[in-house]
C-alpha cells in the first residue's frame, strides 16, 4: 500500500516488487554462503605461498531510485551489508514511506552504525558526504550524469569503487518466427509498464522487415 500511495504503482506491480525483493535477499544469502566457502584459501605462485581471504571494502554509499524504491535499493544495500561493510543508505526523494516499517528491523538485526539511513534530496546530502573522502564505494542506480557528478566530488576518485545501474537504450528484437500476439503483449508491457518510468523499459523495437507491417498494425 505504501508503494501504491506514494509513487502510484499499481497493486499487482507492488506485490511483485515486494516478492522479488524477498527472493533476492534469500538468493544473495545463498550466494554468500557459497562464496564464503571459498573466501579463504592457500595458493602458491612463483614459489611464494599465500593465504588469501576476502574482506569488506569499507563504507558504501547506497543511492536507490524512486521507481523501484524497495527492490532496486535492496539490490545495492543487502550485498553490501552481508559482505561486512558499513552503509550509508539514502532513499530517493519519493518512495520513502516503505522504509519506515523497516527501521525497527534494521535496528534489531545489525549493530549500531552498520545501516545509516538519511532522508532528503540527493544533491544536498550525497554531495557533501562524497566530499569527505570517507566513501569507499559508490553504489547508485540512476542517471549517468548523477554518477559522474558524485564521483567528481570525491577527493580521491581514482580509488573510489563504483557499483552502478544506469540508463540504457534497451532494444526489443522481433524475428519472423515470433508469435505476434504474444510478442505485442510483451512489447506493450515492456514499454509502458509503470508508464515506462523504468531503466529496463524497452526503448527501441527492431522488427524484421518481413513482418513489420503486420506488427505495426497489431501494435497500433
Q: Where are the model-predicted features located?
A:
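Generic hydrophobic/aromatic pocket-lining and core-packing "Φ" positions
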Residues: 77-78, 126, 184
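Conserved small-residue-rich beta-alpha loop and adjacent elements
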Residues: 38-113
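ALDH superfamily catalytic-core signature
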Residues: 109-110, 137, 145-220
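General beta-strand structural signal in soluble alpha/beta enzymes
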Residues: 89, 117-119, 140-142, 162-166
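A structured beta-alpha segment of the ubiquitous adenosine-cofactor-binding alpha/beta core
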Residues: 49-50, 117-136
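Periplasmic-binding protein-like
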Residues: 78, 136-141
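N-terminal Rossmann-like NAD(P)+-binding subdomain of aldehyde/semialdehyde dehydrogenases
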Residues: 1-49
Amino acid at each position: 500500500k505504501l508503494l501504491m500511495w506514494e509513487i502510484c504503482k499499481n497493486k499487482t506491480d507492488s506485490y511483485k516488487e515486494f516478492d522479488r525483493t524477498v527472493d533476492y535477499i534469500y538468493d544473495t544469502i545463498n550466494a554468500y554462503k557459497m562464496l564464503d566457502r571459498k573466501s579463504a584459501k592457500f595458493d602458491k605462485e612463483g614459489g611464494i605461498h599465500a593465504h588469501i581471504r576476502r574482506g569488506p571494502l569499507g563504507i558504501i554509499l547506497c543511492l536507490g531510485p524512486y521507481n523501484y524504491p524497495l527492490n532496486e535499493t535492496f539490490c545495492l544495500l543487502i550485498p553490501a551489508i552481508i559482505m561486512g561493510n558499513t552503509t550509508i543508505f539514502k532513499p530517493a526523494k519519493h518512495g520513502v514511506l516503505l522504509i519506515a516499517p523497516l527501521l525497527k528491523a534494521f535496528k534489531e538485526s545489525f549493530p549500531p552504525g552498520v545501516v545509516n539511513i538519511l532522508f532528503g534530496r540527493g544533491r544536498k546530502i550525497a554531495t557533501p558526504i562524497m566530499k569527505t573522502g570517507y566513501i569507499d564505494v559508490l553504489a547508485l542506480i540512476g542517471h549517468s550524469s548523477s554518477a559522474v557528478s558524485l564521483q567528481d566530488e570525491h577527493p580521491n576518485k581514482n580509488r573510489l569503487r563504483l557499483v552502478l545501474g544506469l540508463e540504457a537504450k534497451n532494444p526489443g528484437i522481433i524475428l519472423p518466427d515470433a508469435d505476434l500476439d504474444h510478442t505485442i503483449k510483451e512489447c506493450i508491457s515492456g514499454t509502458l509498464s509503470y508508464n515506462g518510468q523504468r531503466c529496463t523499459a524497452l526503448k527501441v523495437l527492431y522488427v524484421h522487415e518481413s513482418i513489420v507491417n503486420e506488427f505495426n498494425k497489431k501494435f497500433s
